[in-house]
Amino acid sequence: MFENMMDLGSLRHGDELIKRGFAKMTKGGVIMDVTTAEQARIAEKAGAVAVMALERVPADIRANGGVARMADPLKIKEIIDAVSIPVMAKVRIGHISEAYVLESLGVDMLDESEVLTPADPFFHINKKIYKVPVVCGARTFPEAVRRIFEGAAMIRTKGEAGTGNIIEAMRHIRKVNDGINVLLRLNESDMKKVAENIASSYFILRKETSKELFGYDNFPDMDDLYYGMDSDKIINGILKTLKEIKKYRRLPVVNFAAGGVATPSDAALMMKMGLDGVFVGSGIFKSKDPARMASAIVEAAENYEDYKTIADVSSGLQGMEGLEIDNIERLQERGW
């Protein structure tokens, strides 16, 4: 269905075509978090379409606390050398320099990730300034629109990383899908109002500065708000993204599940919900049998409506120990 609705040749820029095209190559597959070259080889053997190189899986980041940053370049190089599939790496939200460093290492894709400690309290990276494609998380339809406007080549649910609990990933895909459903019913005037509302996130810094300087937050100068863009350019760019979504009746980039996928059935559920693929963080290498779990999740994602096969590959498997959401820090709330 995605192929029928997406005309890659109609995308706006050459770089955008290449970035979205690369991301689309992962469609239907599973991307696995790995912390060592050996884990990367296990993931590749199990059928992962790509691996995400990082220092610690989200469950360990959550348990250990502290500031979580990009992985050691040496570790990333070791993982790149160990496998033939694409290697991704996480960058802190808004950390322009980390993104350039990772790009220089030759990673195939960046993940501007809420799992790491954010670097910028106001803005995400302008993904259009990098040659390497970038994936971003989204809890809601407006978040997804903002990230695509900024140049994200792939969107994923945020879920609640490191918990083994699928409920938040399900919440996020429901909200994004319902946002699309509402958008399809809007006229041009209503779409402009939606664009203005979604764009308001980029005005927060200027409003705060205005209040600090003048005592009120409606300073009329709205130039140079985000990477040199004024308010009109931001609103029109977001409106253009909304029109693209309305045209295709879905996000114009691949949309993956992430955050809490811990079993083959979880992976099948996400595919059943219409997602294009699955990220698995802690769910594989925090399970009792990582190699079997990795293969089973790949099998379930590929055959998500073949419930007999899912039952067979799940038999005897034990998932990671899960966490209830209510009493933990919500990593998903990082980002804006």
Swiss-Prot record:
Gene Ontology molecular function: pyridoxal 5'-phosphate synthase (glutamine hydrolysing) activity
Positions of D-glyceraldehyde 3-phosphate binding: 174
Keywords for this protein: Lyase, Pyridoxal phosphate, Schiff base
EC number: 4.3.3.6
GO BP terms, alphabetized: amino acid metabolic process; pyridoxal phosphate biosynthetic process; pyridoxine biosynthetic process
Known pathway: Cofactor biosynthesis; pyridoxal 5'-phosphate biosynthesis
Catalytic activity: aldehydo-D-ribose 5-phosphate + D-glyceraldehyde 3-phosphate + L-glutamine = pyridoxal 5'-phosphate + L-glutamate + phosphate + 3 H2O + H(+)
Positions that bind D-ribose 5-phosphate: 33, 162, 260, 281-282
Principal EC category: lyase
Active site: 90
Assembly and binders: In the presence of PdxT, forms a dodecamer of heterodimers.
Protein purpose: Catalyzes the formation of pyridoxal 5'-phosphate from ribose 5-phosphate (RBP), glyceraldehyde 3-phosphate (G3P) and ammonia. The ammonia is provided by the PdxT subunit. Can also use ribulose 5-phosphate and dihydroxyacetone phosphate as substrates, resulting from enzyme-catalyzed isomerization of RBP and G3P, respectively.
Family: Belongs to the PdxS/SNZ family.
Cross-referenced NCBIfam families: PRK04180.1, pyridoxal 5'-phosphate synthase lyase subunit PdxS
PANTHER family: PYRIDOXAL 5'-PHOSPHATE SYNTHASE SUBUNIT SNZ1-RELATED
Protein name from the UniProt record: Pyridoxal 5'-phosphate synthase subunit PdxS
Native organism: Picrophilus torridus (strain ATCC 700027 / DSM 9790 / JCM 10055 / NBRC 100828 / KAW 2/3)
Lineage: Archaea, Methanobacteriati, Thermoplasmatota, Thermoplasmata, Thermoplasmatales
